[in-house]
Structures are given as C-alpha cells and as structure tokens.
From Swiss-Prot:
Domain of life: Bacteria
Record InterPro entries: CyaY (IPR047584), Frataxin/CyaY (IPR002908), Frataxin/CyaY_sf (IPR036524), Frataxin_CS (IPR020895)
GO CC, one annotated term: cytoplasm
GO biological process annotation, one example: iron-sulfur cluster assembly
Keyword Chaperone: no
An MF annotation (GO) of this entry: ferric iron binding
Function summary: Involved in iron-sulfur (Fe-S) cluster assembly. May act as a regulator of Fe-S biogenesis.
Protein name per its UniProtKB record: Iron-sulfur cluster assembly protein CyaY
UniProt family annotation: Belongs to the frataxin family.
Gene: cyaY
Length: 101
C-alpha cells in the first residue's frame, strides 16, 4: 500500500464511524483535524484514532489503552490479528455506548 492509499483507507474508516454514530443517533462529537479523529462522549471522555503515516498504521487510544493496526488481508488488524472494529466496539462500550460496526 502506498501513502495515498493509506490515507484513503483511513478516511474511509473515519467516514464509516461518523455515519454509524449519526445512524444510531448517539450523542458523540466527532472532530477530524489533520491526522487525528477525536470522538468525545457526554462525560468528556475521548477515543482518539490517528494516522501513523510513517508506519502506515492506524492507532486507537481509549479507556482500554492504546492499540496499533496495520492493513492486512483487506482489514485493519493488530499484530495478534484482532480487528480494529472489535477493539472500537469494546472502546465504545467502555465509554458507555453500545454500537456495532
């Protein structure tokens, strides 16, 4: 994957997240600034998703901790093979919201 494809794939993830939050009518603010997507919950807690261009990775930080994801076999996964979406659903739950991607 080249850098342009990387940015396109991450932006698709961010778009999916925004659309799902809107579809579910969740009270979560979504802000995207440069390489960082911030999801802010009612209690002011946050999930941060950011691009790590140098490594072509997607990083997720939440109350669960921090995780790194590489794009392999058409999906974002950790080194252990766990999907980004599974981690994100758990992070939402830890922040008090139920969502399914």
């Amino acid at each position: 994957m080249n850098v342009a494809e990387f940015h396109q794939k991450v932006e698709q993830v961010w778009q999916q997240i925004e659309e799902k939050i809107d579809d579910e009518a969740l009270s979560i603010d979504t802000e995207i600034h440069g390489a960082v997507c911030t999801l802010t919950f009612d209690d002011e807690s946050q999930i941060i998703i950011n691009k790590q261009e140098a490594m072509l990775e997607l990083w997720l930080a939440s109350k669960l901790g921090g995780f790194h994801f590489a794009f392999r076999d058409c999906e974002w996964v950790t080194a252990e093979g766990r999907s980004f979406w599974a981690h994100l659903e758990e992070a939402f739950a830890r922040h008090g919201e139920q969502i399914s991607f």
